[in-house]
């Protein structure tokens, strides 16, 4: 056993000796062929900018170094200190020459320029120009350069919202059709006053008369007044109100309509003031919230005022006829009975027809019947009741609307006497 192990160990040692011999021969051959003394490299040499590691040349690449030799630049360059010191790069800039001009220099320059100018004798010898002859222009023939100062600027009228909408012919018919469908939705109940335990029709008439005065005091649009009364009737159709809170309902409704329609609506403090401080701001705001909740925030409703203005534009009526139809439309606001049972478009058609009859015009032109989709037979009943209201207007307890339309702004149409009878053909 010991011999076997000993012989094995001897063989291993001989193999190692043989390998060492081969390595010595290879090293000697490399040294002899390359004639390069390979320095013994220490584990961690001194790292400086001067010591550049150059790989030893191999026997296979002992020839001239070509462009693909990775050490060719290492042999040529050194990134250490250079013999040439770093010098700053300078750019030469010429200093600007400032020329100081004096009075003498300017005079000399001008004299030299004048001396250089020499006029040709042929130019100076030209005859002088003769004066142009006066040309007579006949202004009566309408010269394009003559302004007609006799034309006076027409009085500029404020542009209202309805006029802008109806001025678009592509959409006017669709808008009218849509509003005719919308007026049937969310209507107030005609007989709601019978279910109110503490208020009556006369109290409502007083409230409407007061709201007409408020709208005139604050110069609110007519549409604002019609919207506010629409909110009141719809609210009272669903809610019972005590007489002490009826004016609060009217003030809050006017406040909502003003914020919807007006550009600069009155502040809530103004509506407290017009009630003679009967209510506080907190109460007006709470009632506003309650009304909007009951109405489901549906405040965009087509009114009698909108349809009346639309029919007047369709018929191309004059200002007197339009003002009279507006006056008749507002008279229907005071009395809930019987006008709540009619659609706003029906009342508007009847008011314009009655205005035409009063002023001696054609009651309902065929062109208007075609555009409005209304015939006289469809609103004849409303026309009869409106005629009775027109006759009884001077004797009505509430006179705010009549006083309003006595103004020259509305051509004093409330002073026009109603016709003796309704004479028209259906």
From Swiss-Prot:
Sequence ranges of Polar residues compositional bias: 1-11
SUPFAM superfamilies: Cyclin-like
GO molecular function: cyclin-dependent protein serine/threonine kinase regulator activity
Protein name from the UniProt record: G2/mitotic-specific cyclin-A
Family stated for the protein in its record: Belongs to the cyclin family. Cyclin AB subfamily.
InterPro entries from the UniProt entry: Cyclin, Cyclin-A_N, Cyclin-like_dom, Cyclin-like_sf, Cyclin_A/B-like, Cyclin_C-dom, Cyclin_N, Cyclins_cyclin-box
One family name in Pfam for this protein: Cyclin_N2
Record-linked CDD domains: CYCLIN_CCNA_rpt1 (cd20504), CYCLIN_CCNA_rpt2 (cd20505)
Origin: domain of life: Eukaryota
Record region (Disordered): 1-22
Keywords per UniProt: Cell cycle, Cell division, Cyclin, Mitosis
Function statement: Essential for the control of the cell cycle at the G2/M (mitosis) transition. Interacts with the CDC2 and CDK2 protein kinases to form MPF. G2/M cyclins accumulate steadily during G2 and are abruptly destroyed at mitosis.
Gene Ontology annotations of biological process type: cell division; mitotic cell cycle phase transition
């Amino acid at each position: 056993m010991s011999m076997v192990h000993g012989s094995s160990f001897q063989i291993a040692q001989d193999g190692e000796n043989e390998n060492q011999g081969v390595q010595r021969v290879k090293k000697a051959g490399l040294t002899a062929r390359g004639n390069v003394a390979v320095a013994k490299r220490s584990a961690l040499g001194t790292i400086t900018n001067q010591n550049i590691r150059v790989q030893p040349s191999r026997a296979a690449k002992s020839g001239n170094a070509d462009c693909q030799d990775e050490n060719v630049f290492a042999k040529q360059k050194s990134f250490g200190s250079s013999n040439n010191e770093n010098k700053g790069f300078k750019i030469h800039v010429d200093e600007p020459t400032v020329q100081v001009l004096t009075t003498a220099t300017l005079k000399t320059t001008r004299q030299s320029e004048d001396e250089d100018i020499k006029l040709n004798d042929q130019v100076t010898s030209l005859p002088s120009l003769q004066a142009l002859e006066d040309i007579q222009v006949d202004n009566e023939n309408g010269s394009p350069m003559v302004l007609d100062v006799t034309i006076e600027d027409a009085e500029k009228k404020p542009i209202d919202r309805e006029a802008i909408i109806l001025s678009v012919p592509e959409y006017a018919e669709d808008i009218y059709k849509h509003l005719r469908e919308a007026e049937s939705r969310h209507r107030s109940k005609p007989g709601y006053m019978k279910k109110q335990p503490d208020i009556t029709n006369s109290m409502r008439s007083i409230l409407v008369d007061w709201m007409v005065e408020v709208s005139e005091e604050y110069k609110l649009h007519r549409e604002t007044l019609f919207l506010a009364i629409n909110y009141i009737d719809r609210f009272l159709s669903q809610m019972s109100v005590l007489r002490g809170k009826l004016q609060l309902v009217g003030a809050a409704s006017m406040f909502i309509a003003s914020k919807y329609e007006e550009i600069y609506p009155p502040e809530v403090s103004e509506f407290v003031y017009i009630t003679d401080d009967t209510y506080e701001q907190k109460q007006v705001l709470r009632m506003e919230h309650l009304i909007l909740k009951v109405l489901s925030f549906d405040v965009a409703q087509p009114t009698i005022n909108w349809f009346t203005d639309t029919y007047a534009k369709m018929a191309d009526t004059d200002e007197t006829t339009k003002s009279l139809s507006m006056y008749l439309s507002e008279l229907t606001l005071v009395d809930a009975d019987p006008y709540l049972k009619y659609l706003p478009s029906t009342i508007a058609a009847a008011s314009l027809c009655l205005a035409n009859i009063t002023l001696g015009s054609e009651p309902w032109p065929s062109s208007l019947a075609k555009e409005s989709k209304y015939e006289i037979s469809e609103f004849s009943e409303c026309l009869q009741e409106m005629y009775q209201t027109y006759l009884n207007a001077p004797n009505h307890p509430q006179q705010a609307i009549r006083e309003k339309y006595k103004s020259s702004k509305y051509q004093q149409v409330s002073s026009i006497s109603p016709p003796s009878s309704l004479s028209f053909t259906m």
